[in-house]
């Protein structure tokens, strides 16, 4: 337990603005950068999450996340530490071991891939989850299919949230029932103390910008890069693209670097991926843009088939043409055994773009 302080060491007194950690970004689209987080950044986020997610001293967290990343090192650990709760610590994710320990736990946090693997375990049942009060997902998009299947199987609704190395947590779906419903496909509302805006007209898609006491101090030894990432009025440009719906829920559309511009038109991959993921035989998809001699970029989809299925590319394209503008429809579909991911479960689209860059002879 973390409820009492050890008398074997003298606590180090630190000021809120002193550097606490340098956390390197995931780097799915380029070179990783060292985000400098202060003690004040970490404390403000920990206190906010403790209150918002209702951390208690009798909580038991199943901790399976790597501690080189903000999700495992801060988001999961700090809530338990601040509340004086217990942690069951795993050095890696083992679905059978997690299921075996669920009956004595109350909180679990994981990336979407872990929830898919839990659903594949026969022992993952409502009975196994009887003491659980909170399942949190983040670090990568959670498929609506996984969201729905998990609720049906466990009786629990996953709480999806949004954050990044530079900011820790920014938004969260509601925890308390009185604060609203947890909506699949969204990351909820800005957390208390966090301001969030979208650089676009109301309801439209644009760049997400944030500010608050949780925002980092800058990138380690990269002053020019730090300056580039903040607006003139002090808002941090997350590099994510999203929108705020009429009910105030934040939707993440994707990374700005993943935006495809084909023939002068913008294509947001998440829109096309959501449609593909709902089609027969498709387990998941990644939509990318690769060099095209006529259009600048050509839209390409990379699919993973469901077990035992063989997706019909022509049929999928035909269905897409009935639902979205023609310029958004992939010019090619590829079926692969799995999508490349980093350690936090994010699809590495940069690797897919590199693999298919010569497809149209535009590289």
Specify the residue positions occupied by each region the protein language model found.
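Gly/Ser/Thr-rich phosphate-binding loop
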Residues: 53, 102-110, 119-181, 195
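Conserved ATP/PPi-binding loop(s) of AMP-dependent carboxylate-activating enzymes
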Residues: 175, 186-193, 201-229, 265-267
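Active-site glycine-centered loops adjacent to acidic/histidine catalytic or metal-binding residues
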Residues: 139, 163, 188, 240, ...
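Conserved AMP-binding A3 loop
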Residues: 20-44
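Conserved AMP-binding/adenylation subdomain of ANL enzymes
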Residues: 43-60, 68-107, 121-123
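Conserved pre-ATP/AMP-binding loop-to-beta segment of ANL
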Residues: 5-24, 31, 54-60
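Conserved S/T- and glycine-rich ATP-binding loop of Class I adenylate-forming
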Residues: 19, 25-28, 61, 67, ...
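AMP-binding/adenylate-forming catalytic core of the ANL superfamily
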Residues: 200, 212, 217-218, 225, ...
């Amino acid at each position: 337990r973390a409820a009492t302080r050890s008398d074997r060491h003298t606590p180090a007194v630190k000021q809120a603005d002193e550097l606490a950690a340098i956390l390197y970004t995931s780097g799915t689209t380029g070179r990783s950068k060292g985000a400098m987080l202060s003690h004040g950044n970490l404390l403000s986020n920990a206190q906010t999450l403790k209150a918002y997610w209702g951390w208690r001293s009798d909580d038991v967290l199943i901790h399976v996340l790597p501690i080189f990343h903000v999700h495992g090192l801060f988001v999961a650990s700090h809530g338990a530490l601040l509340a004086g709760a217990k942690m069951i610590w795993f050095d890696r994710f083992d679905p059978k071991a997690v299921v075996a320990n669920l009956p004595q736990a109350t909180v679990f946090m994981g990336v979407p891939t872990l929830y898919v693997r839990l659903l594949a375990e026969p022992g993952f049942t409502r009975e196994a989850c009887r003491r659980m009060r909170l399942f949190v997902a983040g670090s990568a998009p959670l498929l609506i299919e996984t969201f729905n299947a998990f609720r049906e199987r466990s009786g629990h609704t996953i709480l999806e949230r949004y954050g990044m190395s530079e900011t820790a947590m920014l938004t969260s779906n509601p925890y308390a029932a009185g604060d609203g419903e947890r909506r699949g496909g969204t990351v909820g509302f800005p957390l208390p103390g966090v301001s969030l805006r979208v650089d676009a007209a109301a309801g439209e898609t644009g760049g997400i910008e944030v500010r608050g006491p949780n925002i980092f101090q800058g990138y380690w030894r990269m002053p020019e890069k730090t300056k580039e990432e903040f607006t003139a009025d002090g808002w941090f440009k997350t590099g994510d693209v999203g929108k705020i719906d009429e009910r105030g829920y934040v939707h993440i559309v994707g990374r700005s670097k993943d935006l495809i511009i084909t023939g002068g038109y913008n294509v947001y991959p998440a829109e096309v991926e959501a449609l593909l993921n709902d089609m027969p035989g498709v387990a998941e998809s990644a939509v990318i843009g690769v060099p095209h001699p006529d259009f600048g970029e050509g839209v390409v989809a990379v699919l993973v088939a469901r077990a035992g299925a063989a997706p019909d590319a022509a049929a999928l394209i035909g269905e897409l043409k009935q639902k979205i503008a023609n310029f958004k429809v992939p010019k090619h579909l590829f079926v692969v055994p799995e999508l490349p991911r980093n350690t936090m479960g994010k699809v590495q689209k940069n690797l897919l773009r590199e693999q298919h860059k010569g497809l149209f002879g535009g590289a």
